[in-house]
Amino acid sequence: MSMPATAADGTDAILRLRDERKKHPEIISVEFPGSTKWREAYDAIYSHGAIIENPYLALRIYMNESQAVDVYLKQNPGLECRNTAFYSTPEAVAAGQGTAVLKVGKSIVAGSFRGFNGREAVDIADVESRGQAVTNDSTVTVTDRGWLYNGHRIDVCERYTAHANSAVIDVEILLRGVKEGDIFCTGVQKLETDNRGGFTLPATAYSSGKNAPDGKKPEIVEAGALCVECDPANLADTGETDLNYLLLLKPDKDGYIRYTITASRPQ
């Protein structure tokens, strides 16, 4: 296992098991059979999924069929999530700590990878196995083996890479078993209030606005500006739904899709 990162290192990647004794041991990788109930896998991981972090933001990728990419924004540059694990208190935020800023729900959030059924994004639901791993202090991988999509099985490997001097997270998707006509998607959510968003050339989806990340605490409102940009060679089309601005994606001849995720507080 790699050594814990420090603020000077500029990136960190964290995967922990949830522990009833609240030790939450760090692990290198985990994989669940496809038959595992989503809530069991989701709750088995502390923070509900792997975390990847640069000095400006952090992402966590949920360990379930949505594989939602949630966003944590910093008030001050540095690494925080080894301590906060996405669970910031109002008092800590008032003192300058970062916090999760999005209400995930059923949206694509910010750069989640999904299928597309011609109308909307679809989860990676029927799989033979699902896993996450920390490759090093700057890389997290997510794997779905044997995803049943459009009547055939696909193997998916998602790689998320952070950089010490950038707020951008690079995403590389490798697909094996894709057939002609298979279309996938990513994009950004529409925020609950004051939402502004859409698409810019050549291949970018963006949005900004406000929402209450925790439905149990509607009085705590956060603001976020989201941007996902894909390789123009991977862009098949764009689409807008009630929840999302979507980039519709096709893999290249080698099975790759590439895009970037970034977020900030609106100016």
Question: Locations of the language-model features?
Answer:
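Solvent-exposed N-terminal domain segments of exported/luminal and surface proteins
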Residues: 3-124
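A recognition module on extended beta-rich or small alphabeta surfaces enriched in W/G with H and D/E
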Residues: 81-84, 88, 200-235
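Extended, loop-rich substrate-binding clefts of extracytoplasmic carbohydrate-active enzymes
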Residues: 94-165
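A short, structured loop/turn motif at beta-sheet edges
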Residues: 132-137, 163-165, 175-182, 250-256
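Beta-strand secondary-structure signal
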Residues: 139-141, 157-159, 170-172, 185, ...
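Beta-strand elements of well-folded, non-transmembrane domains
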Residues: 144-148, 162-166, 175-179, 190-192, ...
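Acidic (Asp/Glu-rich), glycine- and aromatic
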Residues: 156, 167-199
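Beta-strand-rich recognition/accessory modules
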Residues: 224-267
